[in-house]
Amino acid sequence: MNRRDFILKTTGVAAASLSYSQLYAQIQKQVEPTSNQANYDVIVLGVGSMGASTCYHLAKRGFKVLGLEQFDIPHELGSHAGQSRIIRKAYGEGSDYVPLMERAYQNWQALESETGSQVYYKTGLAYFGAPDDPFLSTVLGSSKKYNIPVNNLTVEECDRKYPQFKLPQNFQRLEEPEAGFITPERSILLYVQQAIFNGAVIRTKEKVLEWRHETSGSVTVVTDRGTYKAGKLVITAGPWAAKVMPSLASKLTVTRQAVAWVKPKKWDDFTLGKFPCWILENKEYDFYGFPILPVGTFGGPLGLKLALHYPGADTTDPDFVNRKTKESDEKILIEFLNRFIPDGYENTLVMKTCLYTNTPDHNFIIDYLSEYDKDVVFATGFSGHGFKFVSVVGEILADMAMNGSTPLPIGFLNAKRFDKAGI
C-alpha cells in the first residue's frame, strides 16, 4: 500500500466523526519523523495557520512541498491557539478586505466538503459601540458597498434577542447574521492532513537555523536536522517573522495578549445556540467574545471566552514571552463583564496568552522579499485579525510562489506602502 492510500485508509473523510483529540492524534502519526528527500519545488517555513493552508494549496496543485515547523502542530506559543476565531464579512478594518473575505468563506466551505468536518459555525455576530464609532461606521460601509446583510437593531429588539448584554441607551446595536466562528486548531489539522494526503512532507519540532538565496536562483534552508533545497520559499513564520526576515523588523511589533475563559453566573444562558459571537467597541479598548463551546468537539478550555483586542499591548520577543498572565489582565476583563454582561462572571477558569504580530497601520503584509526577485514570498503582520483569512491566504501564497502573481486583490497589502513613510 502506498503512502497516499495508507493516509486515505486511516483518515480520509473520517475526520467528520473524530473528536478534536482524536484528530490531533491521527495527524501526529502522519507527520514525517525523517525525510530522505532534499529537493522540493517549494519549502514553507512555518506550519501554523497560514503555513498549513499554503502547504495544502501547493500540494493540491501537484507541487513537491516541504513544510517545516519548529514546534508541534498545532501549538500554543504563537497566534493561532484558543478554540475559536470570529469570522465576518462586513469588515470594520476596511472594505478592501471584503473580496478576500468572500473568497475565504468559499475556501472554508471547500475544506469542509473535502474532509466532511465542520470548521465554520454560523452563530451570528453582534456589534456594539458608540454612535460615532469608526469601526462600526466601516462595518456599515462595507455592508452597503458589498450588499452584506447587517441588521441595525433597536434597543427593544436587542434586549429581546441578546438579554445577556446591558448597554448604554445610545449604543449602536448591529447584527451580522452570516458571521460566526472558525475552529482554529481543527482547521490547521485538517489542512495539514489534506496537504499530506496530496503528497506534502510536513516536519515538526525542526528549527530553521538559516536560509539563503543561491546565485542559481534556488533557495537553501538549513535546520537543526537537515539541509533542503527548493526553487521557491514561502515564509509564514508568525511572530518569528522579523527574526527570519530581518529587513522587516522595522515594520513588525510583537505584542502579548491575554485571553480568559470564565464561569458565568447563568451558565446555560451563554452556551452555543443561546449566545452569539460579539464585538464591543468602547473608546480606548475593544473587546470580543464567544459562546461556551463543548470541549469534546472543540477542544479546551471550557468556559465563556472573551479577550481584549489591543494591538498596543506589551511588546515582547516571541522566544522570551512571559506566559504568566498579570492581575491587570484579568482585572480589565472582569470590570468589562460586570459593566456590560452582568451575569457573565462568577469566577475565572483559565487565563492564557497569545501573540499579535502588528504592522504600523494594522493591515497585513503579503508580498515578495524584493531583493530575491520572486523566489521568496511571505505573509505577516496579521495584527490580531488574520485567522479568518487563513483559507484564502494559503491560496494567494501558492499563486505568488508558483505563478508569480495572484488574481486576488491584494495590492493594498504590499510592503512598499511603508516606504513612503520611511518605515
Regions picked out by a protein language model, each given a short descriptive name:
Residues 5-27:
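N-terminal export signals
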Residues 38-40, 223-232:
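Core beta-strand elements of the Rossmann-like FAD/NAD(P) dinucleotide-binding domain
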Residues 45, 228-239:
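Short hydrophobic core segments
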Residues 56-60, 118-121, 227, 239-374:
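Active-site substrate-recognition segment that forms the wall
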Residues 60-79:
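Glycine-rich FAD pyrophosphate-binding loop
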Residues 132-198, 203-204, 210-217:
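Flavin (FAD/FMN) cofactor-binding and adjacent substrate-gating region
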